[in-house]
A protein has these predicted regions:
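Short alpha-helical transmembrane segments in multi-pass integral membrane proteins
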Residues: 1-14, 68-135, 184-248, 304-369, ...
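N-terminal transmembrane alpha-helices
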Residues: 2-30, 34-35, 51-63, 92-99, ...
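Transmembrane helical elements of multi-pass membrane transporters/channels
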Residues: 9-25, 131, 206-210, 214, ...
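Transmembrane alpha-helix boundary and packing residues in multipass membrane permease domains
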Residues: 14, 18, 29-30, 66, ...
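Residue-level hotspots within pore-lining transmembrane alpha-helices
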Residues: 16, 20, 24, 53, ...
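Helix-terminus/linker motif at the lipid-water interface of multi-pass membrane proteins
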Residues: 23-41, 110-119, 175-179, 184-194, ...
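Small-residue-rich hydrophobic transmembrane alpha-helices
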Residues: 40-100, 139-158, 276-342, 373-396
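Short runs within selected transmembrane alpha-helices of multi-pass transporters and secretion channels
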Residues: 61, 131-150, 158-166, 199-214, ...
Length: 452
């Protein structure tokens, strides 16, 4: 009962937070879908690029989460506060550097990866990336702050901030994408419609506001956090080493993983605009299906890290096993619900019949594959919480670059199964990685990493 209560107390706020994180992307994709398949294709293409860099920031967040969680387990609050400062400054420097480089090479990047796309799709993609890349520093800062708070067990603040961000994004998104023409009390209210530019503007503003709020919450502190001033800042080599010992392998894993996804996206671009749009819609709906799984994966990182920090090896392993089994049951149920409603939910994104038909195939295949998702992602998150990031990095690289890309290319391009073939390659990757993580869990090497 202790494990169950402990998990539920942490997982429910994270699940609510992840629901709203998911909705942030879903609403943007949905609203872009009603502009046209060119717009939703552009959003999906740019998100594939953005996710490469966002994954780097997420890796820093994982490093901060694990180090803070283990320091909390040791009741070393002084080191917790130093870790927060070091992680935030590193994140800001890294994200500003990436932003500048991406601004310089933005057009070349679009042409390099998506040169075969239709001109209207590419022009929309260039507009969308110009706005979203400027939010990288805000995304990095918010992700690190969220990770730190989760490492402390404070999961409610990220939840509330993400909820508010969604309200801002949906409200501004509707106004900026479609424009309004109202006449309340005889007062004429009109705003122009900005189309895909409006979609980019709304999500950018929401991210900036969310970053400001979460940083303010972090500085207010809690029972573990009492930061004081960041500046004058001095690099603490030992703390940075602890963060990057976790963050670098996690970052390389996510960088190579998302680079692989970008290559897969290039395969899909050659299949035409309908295929690109279907893939974007399918991924958006898959993010809805995965909310519970993502929440339990994030919980695994924090809980395993805290148990390891306390020296409770048995508790770490039993909690990770419980989370994996619980996620499997939950995702099986969610998948069973989404199989019959796939046509209805696809039609919420677009009225294009061919796009809807392909999206239905993708959603239903994803629902069937959900039972193997937890062993690939929840186990991986728990291993990272223990500091076993080098193993998860190598496993993810093997799964992506040998199995997902190769299988996806053969099935999707060579054998002409289309986007569905690409997705079957993704499920093969999940199964291979999950099998390797299960083998790792049976041993004890993953429990022997000293992080904090």
């Amino acid at each position: 009962m202790f494990i169950r209560k402990n998990v539920i107390k942490l997982a429910i706020p994270i699940m609510i937070e992840q629901t709203f994180v998911m909705l942030l992307g879903v609403f943007n994709t949905m609203m872009a879908g009603h502009i046209g398949e060119e717009a939703v294709s552009a959003v999906g293409m740019v998100d594939s690029i953005n996710n490469i860099f966002i994954s780097v920031f997420a890796a820093l967040s994982v490093g901060a989460t694990v180090v803070v969680a283990q320091q909390i387990g040791k009741k070393d609050n002084e080191k917790v506060n130093e870790t927060i400062k070091q992680a935030l400054v590193s994140g800001v420097i890294l994200s500003f550097t990436i932003t500048i480089l991406m601004w310089v090479f933005r057009t070349g990047v679009i042409n390099l990866f998506y040169g075969s796309a239709e001109e209207l799709v590419k022009s929309n993609a260039k507009l969308y990336i110009e706005f979203t890349l400027f939010t990288y520093p805000f995304i990095a800062t918010q992700q690190i702050a969220n990770g730190i708070l989760r490492g402390c067990g404070d999961v409610k603040k990220p939840m509330y901030v993400t909820m508010f961000m969604n309200i801002v994004n949906v409200t501004l998104g509707y106004i900026l994408i479609y424009g309004i023409d109202l006449n309340p009390l005889g007062i004429n209210l009109q705003t122009p419609s900005y189309g895909i530019t409006g979609a980019a503007m709304s999500i950018a503003i929401a991210r900036i506001i969310g970053c400001i709020i979460i940083i303010r919450a972090l500085f207010k502190g809690n029972e573990f956090i009492s930061m004081g001033k960041i500046f004058p800042f001095k690099i603490d080599v030992e703390t940075q080493k602890s963060i990057f010992n976790i963050g670098i392998p996690a970052g390389v894993e996510q960088l190579l993983f998302n680079a692989g996804k970008l290559i897969v996206q290039v395969f899909i671009v050659t299949m035409g605009t309908s295929a690109i749009a279907s893939n974007a819609i399918g991924m958006s709906i898959a993010s809805i299906i995965n909310v519970i799984g993502n929440a339990l994966a994030l919980s695994a990182t924090t809980l395993v890290g805290q148990y390891i920090g306390r020296g409770d090896i048995k508790g770490a392993k039993s909690t990770l096993l419980y989370l994996t089994k619980f996620a499997t049951i939950c995702l099986f149920v969610v998948g069973a619900i989404f199989i019959p409603i796939a046509p209805w939910i696809s039609s919420m994104y677009t009225q294009n019949a061919s796009v809807i038909d392909i999206s239905i195939q993708l959603i239903r295949s994803d629902c069937l594959a959900m039972v193997i998702w937890p062993i690939s992602f929840v186990l991986s998150a728990g291993l990272k919480g223990a500091g076993d990031t080098r193993y998860t990095m190598m496993t993810a690289v093997i799964g992506m670059w040998i199995f997902r890309i190769f299988t996806g290319y053969v099935l999707g391009v060579v054998l002409e199964f289309g986007v569905l073939g690409i997705w079957i390659g993704m499920y093969t990757d999940w199964l291979v990685r999950g099998t390797l993580y299960c083998l790792r869990l049976r041993g004890t090497k993953w429990l022997k990493h000293k992080v904090a």
